[in-house]
Amino acid sequence: MKIGMFDSGVGGLTVLKSVRKVYDKVDIVYLGDTARVPYGIKSKETIITYAKESANFLINQNVDVILIACNSVSANAMEALQEMFDIPIVGVIEAGVEAALKSSKTKHVGIIGTSATINSNKYQERLEAFNIKTYAKACPLFVPIVEEKLINTDISKKAVEFYLKEFKDLKDIDTLILGCTHYPLLEEDIKAFLPHINLVSSSDAIISYINNIVKNEGNATTELYFTDISQNTSELVEYIMGQKYDLKYVNVESLALNC
């Protein structure tokens, strides 16, 4: 079985890593659109366009299922993709919501994500349907900090403090959704700043959503494609995955031409 995944950059590799721990035999094709990262500050229409191009690329790799390893796309383009393609397409938002519902005892949940994810209100609407009080905050600098390999630095710590200082005073919140697949890479800094809050990530929670779709069979291959490959990209892939990979380049213009 072949799983396709895509994200705006390297953050979706946190999803790939979680999936690979459970499904060690499947074949995985990953596309990171590093030439156009971040998606979270772009319009819904642009996100849909980019998402269609990425999904179409994966379809052409003969994948059996697509995991949208990006909250901005899951929030703004999943319905459009499901209408366009016939194979199963799974986003990360529902998994994050389910994890938060299991985690929270106070029924007060914080959500952090890109501007596109927070402004979509998808997390808020899903949680409020279960009578959960939500507190949402966009953290647009977190993705560039990760993509620039500034993890666990003074810069990342200052950004965490800048964006999350209001959560320090919201004593009822016991759970914080990391509503972007890049954000688990800042988990150490976030946990140090908010030690009293449980952090949940859709990158881990997605496993329960694909159990009925994915069969653990294949040749255990992993192909990593990126629309821009810099030294940072290679180093981040090794940092996240714990090993080196042969990264493959895809021209971003070819994505549009073949869609």
Swiss-Prot record:
The keyword Isomerase is annotated on this UniProt entry: yes
Keyword annotations of the record: Cell shape, Cell wall biogenesis/degradation, Isomerase, Peptidoglycan synthesis
Keyword Isomerase assigned: yes
Annotated substrate binding sites: D7, S8, Y39, G40, N71, S72, T181, H182
Active site per UniProt: C70, C180
A Pfam match: Asp_Glu_race
Function of the protein: Provides the (R)-glutamate required for cell wall biosynthesis.
Assigned protein family: Belongs to the aspartate/glutamate racemases family.
Name of the protein: Glutamate racemase
Lineage: Bacteria, Pseudomonadati, Aquificota, Aquificia, Aquificales
